[in-house]
């Protein structure tokens, strides 16, 4: 069911991560500057925002399974939707493509690698990891907004997700 949202934030890493202790889940603020900046914006928007991110750790995934993520709107002031991505697919998406290829390209260090072309391994990682994950993020984002919402995709991890969303929703306001 679509909800009345103003902003859909989409990133690989979310605003919090879960840590299990004595059978209970505690949240820790997400690492890096992205979390602090977007968390502030999401809190200002409150119920008019949702943050979609990967469930990265096993504790994140278990928190999803046990329903611990349902307490996040009360704790944070906005909704969070975590995606459970298969570990092998995530490795291709995050490590093989995002970190080993796109990080260098986006930081103008491509020439330092002295790579003139990619092999089958990189192509497989793109086709079986990076693209499917980006498509999934775009699909989930499309389930979380009304037409007047702004969808913000963050960082090179999700470089192709806006295009997938644009195909399905040509008039949607999208930032990347």
Region spans (language model):
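Catalytic cores of carbohydrate-active enzymes across secretory and cytosolic contexts
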Residues: 1-176
């Amino acid at each position: 069911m679509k909800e009345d949202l103003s902003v859909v934030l989409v990133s690989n890493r979310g605003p919090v991560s879960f840590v299990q202790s004595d059978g209970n889940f505690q949240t820790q603020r997400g690492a890096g500057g992205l979390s602090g900046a977007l968390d502030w914006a999401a809190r200002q928007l409150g119920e008019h925002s949702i943050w979609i991110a990967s469930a990265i750790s096993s504790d994140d995934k278990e928190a999803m399974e046990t329903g611990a993520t349902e307490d996040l709107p009360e704790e944070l002031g906005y909704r969070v939707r975590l995606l459970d991505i298969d570990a092998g697919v995530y490795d291709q998406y995050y490590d093989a493509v995002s970190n080993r290829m796109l990080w260098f390209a986006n930081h103008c260090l491509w020439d330092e690698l002295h790579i003139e072309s990619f092999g089958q391994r990189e192509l497989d990682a793109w086709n079986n990891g990076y693209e499917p994950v980006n498509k999934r993020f775009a699909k989930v984002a499309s389930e979380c907004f009304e037409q007047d919402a702004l969808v913000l995709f963050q960082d090179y991890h999700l470089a192709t997700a806006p295009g997938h969303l644009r195909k399905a929703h040509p008039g949607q306001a999208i930032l990347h």
